[in-house]
Amino acid sequence: MSSHTQAILFSKDLYDTKSARRWLMHHNLSPIKRVHDTTHFLRYRIREPNERYDYRTKILTTGIKAVIGCLPYAMLD
């Protein structure tokens, strides 16, 4: 696998825990831990981080970001 979703972040201005969990269920994502409640985001970890991957945060839609793990190009050979 060359990439995976490590976490999903929901803006607290637009989502509460109930609506965030509904979005996760609708997209077949299962958090492995309880929500990490920060100042601005609700963070749901989907997979444990792995040091072999480089991580990038991508905006999915208004109020939702995904942390994506990608193998470095050197490891894809």
Specify the residue positions occupied by each region the protein language model found.
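Mitochondrial intermembrane space
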Residues: 1-77
